[in-house]
Amino acid sequence: MIKTTLLFFATALCEIIGCFLPWLWLKRNASIWLLLPAGISLALFVWLLTLHPAASGRVYAAYGGVYVCTALIWLRVVDGVKLTLYDWTGALIALCGMLIIVAGWGRT
């Protein structure tokens, strides 16, 4: 379970970076060259999703919970926004959903 969760967090980080870099280019007039590492990051994101031992839809559903948590960490660390009680509560609920889905992988 820990290996799967860490893999999900790595996957989420690749997706967020792959989306953040084009956002910087479009919204903040950053260099167009940011699209190159963004593409690499998104390709790595897709590859990491294939490493999970479950049906794709189940992987995507469970991954969503970890993505929420990772995005909130990004919000705090990169964007510098203080998390609210609602952020923490939502992250906890999303992470519990992910754990329930992953716990059932070997039982179907």
UniProtKB/Swiss-Prot annotation:
Q: Which SUPFAM superfamilies match?
A: Multidrug resistance efflux transporter EmrE
Periplasmic-side positions: 1-5, 52-60, 106-108
Tell where it localizes. Answer: Cell inner membrane
* Spans traversing the lipid bilayer: 6-26, 31-51, 61-81, 85-105
Topology of the protein relative to the lipid bilayer: Multi-pass membrane protein
Q: Which Pfam families match?
A: UPF0060
Q: Which domain of life is it from?
A: Bacteria
Provide Cytoplasmic-side residue ranges: 27-30, 82-84
Keywords per UniProt: Cell inner membrane, Cell membrane, Membrane, Transmembrane, Transmembrane helix
Q: Does the keyword Cell membrane apply?
A: yes
* InterPro entries xrefs: UPF0060
Q: Could you name the Gene Ontology cellular component terms for this entry?
A: plasma membrane
Q: What is its main location?
A: membrane
> Which family does this protein fall into?
Belongs to the UPF0060 family.
Q: What protein does this entry describe?
A: UPF0060 membrane protein YnfA
Source species? Escherichia coli O1:K1 / APEC
Q: Which gene encodes it?
A: ynfA
